[in-house]
Amino acid sequence: MASESAAMDILDSAEASLNVASTALVEKEKKVQPATDETTPEKKAKMEIDAEMKDLTNDIPNSRKSQEKDPDALEDAKDPEADSSIELLCSPTPAEATDVDAMASKTESDNSVELLESPLKSPSSNDVNDEELLPLEEKEKPGPAKELEPKESEPDSKESSKSEALADSSIELISSPTSDDSLAKEKEVEVKEEHGQQAEAQVLQEIPRKADDSFKLQDDIAMEEDVPVPRSKAMQESKETQKTSKTTTKLEPLVDSIKDAIEDCINCNCKRLKKQYVLACVAILNFYKVPRKLKRSQYVCLDCYDTAVEMYEEYAGLLLAKQPLLLREFKQEQADFVTLDSSDEEEDEKTPEKPEFSKNVLDLIENELEDAIKKTLNKVEFSNQFNWSKTILQAKIERLAKKFEEVDLQLAQVQGLADKMHCSVYNSCQVVHKQLPPLDLHQNICPSDYKRLQQLPAAGDIVRPPIKIGETYYAVKNKAIASWVSVSVMEICDTTTGGGVTVKAYKIKYQHMPYPMMKTVAAKHLAYFDPPTVRLPIGTRVIAFFDGTLVGGKEKGVVQSAFYPGIIAEPLKQNNRFRYLIFYDDGYTQYVHHSDVRLVCQASEKVWEDVHPASRDFIQKYVERYAVDRPMVQCTKGQSMNTESNGTWLYARVIEVDCSLVLMQFEADKNHTEWIYRGSLRLAPVFKETQNSLNADCAIHQMRVPRRTEPFIRYTKEMESSNMQVDQQIRAIARKSTSKSGSPASTAAPPTGSSSSSAVRHLNNSTIYVDDDTRPKGQVVHFTAKRNMPPKIFKSHKCNPGCPFPMMHRLDSYSPLSKPLLSGWERMFMKQKTKRTVVYRGPCGRNLRNMAEVHNYLRLTNNVLNVDNFDFTPDLRCLAEYYIESTIVKEADISKGQEKMAIPLVNYYDNTLPPPCEYAKQRIPTEGVNLNLDEEFLVCCDCEDDCSDKESCACWQLTVTGVRYCNPKKPIEEIGYQYKRLHEGVLTGIYECNSRCKCKKNCLNRVVQHSLEMKLQVFKTSNRGWGLRCVNDIPKGAFVCIYAGHLLTEAKANEGGQDAGDEYFADLDYIEVAEQLKEGYESDVERADLDHEDDNYGPDAEDDDDFRPNNYYQKKKEKLRSSRSNSSSTQNTELDSQERTVISFNPNTDLDETVRENSVRRFFGKDQTPFIMDAKTTGNLGRYFNHSCSPNLFVQNVFVDTHDLRFPWVGFFASSHIRSGTELTWNYNYEVGVVPNKVLYCQCGAQNCRVRLL
């Protein structure tokens, strides 16, 4: 019965519209059809039929009431063969039936036939007096007496059958005219069609005029907002007709008050003046453009409901009046809003299922509904609306085009007038323009550098004028590495070398000598007296003035300022403040201005052949690879590193950095300072990079955790544009050297035919060149918690589990920081002077000002939220989400449901997908990896306070002990997690609570072991393959995810890396990192003994294996000192040729960094090496993190399921506040040169980029 009542409600709504449509159709036919003689037989027959149908249609309301009062009687009276449902669908209200009868009595016979061709109404009136309708009346409305007398059931059935027969005969009379009247009716139909076509043509002709009049009328009163636009006469008539046919329906509100109600009006612009609501039907939802929700009830207030109904009535009035709909502008306020709802609705929020239709109703709908709709639309001539709309729109377009032309004409006139005014203003005073010479502006140039730049010569080819007799030059006195002095050329002569080759020699005379001194030298040992007239390129042989005042340490005051031979290591450029970097032959380095450089008269084609043997190899490799890359240490003031000095590696600290030079102060002797080139092999980081490239014949490149905070190596590429011949030769050599094995110490030529096979493989092959303007760009959308209930007004109370609001919907699909705001919390901003602070207000109205108060509140109320759902950073946007509108390829979840949070994949560059990879949440051990996960070997705690007391928690003490070993004074509050935020890495590892602990699963010491909660997205980058970005803001220290994959041994990794690739390898070197952080441990540093009080101490060869003094230079140094002391009268004159102690660019000893004999790894077996995590074919989303030299993530080793130091979990934490839409990156810490014949340049674009990654 419930299904039948629901069907009747649906049919009632369509009943009124069909009746009004029939009434309007009658009015039109009265106007169109010509008058006929009422006395004709056809007319009389149809009048009788009209009277009969009038009696049938007047009994509907009372019959319906009887059906509602006695549904059982209705069920008994229903005949499955009778189309009673369609009759109910078309039955009008009593008021409408009266209007229709009144109209039908005045119309002609054809109008009556037309009216009754629609589906018949079910006869249900009690006022019918005809005797032949009494049985039908008794069937439709059984009285109380009849219901109590079961004996009268048979007469009732007979009467019902008679009524059905009568109803069928009535339908047959109306819908099927007799054959005698067929010819007359055909003629009348033809007349109707002719008049209808003429009327339609007249309407089409009048529509543009009416539309133009309507537009003009609207333009005249557009400025008056309160005065409505007058309607046409036809529209007013349609309104009156609509009012007469309108049915008054009393709506009973389903919700009496909004005070305690959860429901809200579906209209976002509702003023909430009414407190009564009704269920919103599909028509109301469509009117306010609100999507329908199948599992939830949607309500609308009475005001908004009446507004929608009135607007629909205006639409229906125009349709019934057969007027174009576009002549009336229906204004509806629209607001752009996004409803923030969960994808998973609460189970208990379900609308009770509506009863299904009965079989009779379904059969009726299938058979008659489509025909009824077509007939109804045909009666209102709905097909004409398309032609009318097209005509109206075309008229409007033409009118707007005319307006545009007028506006363009007015704009051109105004622009011309403005141009005339502009010219008249500026022509009043004539300005004299004077062309000045162009000025080359350089950014970030200080005044002194700019003045020096103006004094520099222009670039050009190097021209060496011939040596002339009598002119002054510089020449070597004793040795080529010593200082050069001024001489005069006395004579040019020819000499024969040992190979029988005749060369020119020059006899010179030294100036400023108390006695004449003559010598014959070659052109290579002569230099011009004046500075060069052009700028000098890389590798040019010169002598440069060395400033002795900059020398520190033991050589301070000994080395004097003079000209020394060397080569140009850096040209003049803005980065070095327009100075030359000079590599002197004896190993010293210094920056020199152009005025302090002299060009050597003759140089070899291979300039390193003229250099001292101690520096020859280094300068050769430097010149050859300068245009490719230069490895240099990136260091800052105060950093320390191992530095070689006189054959010993000592601990030195950075005092100052000057472009490519660094001033080092040795710890052994505070007075010993030295300027060293940042790419010199005497610096330990550069030396180790070179050694790794030499020893890695078949190595693999692995991502590793940084071992210490030491300076790192950055590879700089110099692309100097020059057309000089020497520079072109150097670049050719540099390019040719890239096809070699890449070993910087190897000088042997490659075998024949191996140049192509040993070519360096560049791995940067994923660049996509696109125009960013034509590609879709994402945007950050700021949501609002629309469905959130505001917190209560605070009243003094003790917080308990009843304070939070009950959860009305699931929050699994939302970001962690948005969950409180969707659960009745508020995040407020307080401003104190210029400082902004964040305060959370709980559902009970209590304000919480820090994480400690939030944690205490969550414990007291047993809230499902956790401390990682809150953050007090003012710049954090909790409800901001990154959104991309259009993509070419999109996947909903690459984890296939394994993660609690879905991980979508997008690609808006092309239709490619990432390489196939099986998703795995945790690491998977392989053959040879013995991973012991026995819980009995784990340390556990018995905390009951969510492990908030680090002093009493056993798991916390493991972490604290490791940190205190290196830094005993560090406060315990700053160690490890701080309310599940890790603000700085713990290199000794973090020990989390495990399954044996008695604490809760969401205690403060459980972070990495939880599944993914951040909303992340895999996307295709333009130059770095696939990457991963955050969809929402991530606070500093928040946990992102772990790095999972196959656990491999080093042997398996080397084997698989060469076959399948090694780009997803991560080294688990926790033991090496922790051991090198131990206090006082420096396996590779030799510290000098500063305590000279113990005279009995005598070191021997076994005490110091690394010390290998250079006896030759020691003796030479002592000889020089003795010679200087014996001849002190000649030290301060230019007569002596100063010879300094030779400093090699290459160290005189090896840096031994082998594994310590007492390493922890020896307890796990012989020849133990770090295990490797491979995410090539199996892994989680951590494999998509790209590298950056300035990353926003850092790596942390965490022990969860095992305390075996060889198998820590690798977790990623945010190193800073990351805004939504930002790519997530971490530092791979690749060792450059480890993999031979492979080059990978960094594309991160950071300011401290290393340029070369592999």
UniProtKB/Swiss-Prot annotation:
SUPFAM superfamilies: DNA-binding domain, SET domain. Residues 1014-1229 form the SET domain. Residues 172-181 have a biased composition (Polar residues). GO terms for cellular component: chromosome; nucleus. Its main location: nucleus. Residues 112-125, 739-759, 1123-1134 have a biased composition (Low complexity). Residues 535-607, 634-691 form the Tudor domain. In the pre-SET domain, Cys residues bind 3 zinc ions that are arranged in a triangular cluster; some of these Cys residues contribute to the binding of two zinc ions within the cluster. Histone methyltransferase that specifically trimethylates 'Lys-9' of histone H3 in ovary. H3 'Lys-9' trimethylation represents a specific tag for epigenetic transcriptional repression by recruiting Su(var)205/HP1 to methylated histones. Plays a central role during oogenesis. This is Histone-lysine N-methyltransferase eggless. It comes from Drosophila pseudoobscura pseudoobscura. The gene is egg.
